[in-house]
Amino acid sequence: MSDRKMWSNLSGQKLNKEQTLWSFGRCKTLILEMFCGAMILTALAAAAGWPVSQPTDIEMDGIDLLVPTDRRAIEEQIERDDPFCLVMPFPCGPWNSLTYWNASRHPEFKIRNEALQKKHVPMLKWLCSIAKKRIARGRLVLMENGQTSRAWNLKCFEELEGLLDGLQSDASFEYGIGDQCLLGQHDRESGEPMRGRTKWGTNGEILKQNINPMWEQ
């Protein structure tokens, strides 16, 4: 998704930084990005003066969330920092439509991908367990993956639907579908918009509002 566009919308609320975070149970940071890539959200938050958690990505810090010890390290960081918003755009490789198309044509590829999925499932279950804890604590969670990702069919993701926010009784975790082009996604060479059909999950009403008008239940 376009991190820059989303953060621009969020930061437009003109919130008092020193008061807002602390009013939500004394969060130490605004955001922790997992699978952060270029860590654009973290950079924008820091540039705006917000305290941020150290983002994590295997290409940046070597933290591999497929490894139990690395997952424990990040879980300890989450407990220590208590970030207000946890962003989790988990890997789509083993679950996307193109992967399944290739698997339907090449039996050996299908075998390899099924093994990779089995390797990823414990990590995805862990992400969902973290999300449950954060939601119950009244913190924001934002998950993202392709609309057709088969990962969404896993029971752990289905169990998140409808979870009530721990601080706001009228808020709950919901999934929505929309196009990333409305958040600024485009082809790097041609500059033309790219649809990027995507599914998000969040308990944050402000996130849902800023993803609108494309939020589809």
Where are the language model's segments positioned?
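Conserved active-site and SAM-binding loop architecture
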Residues: M1-Q217
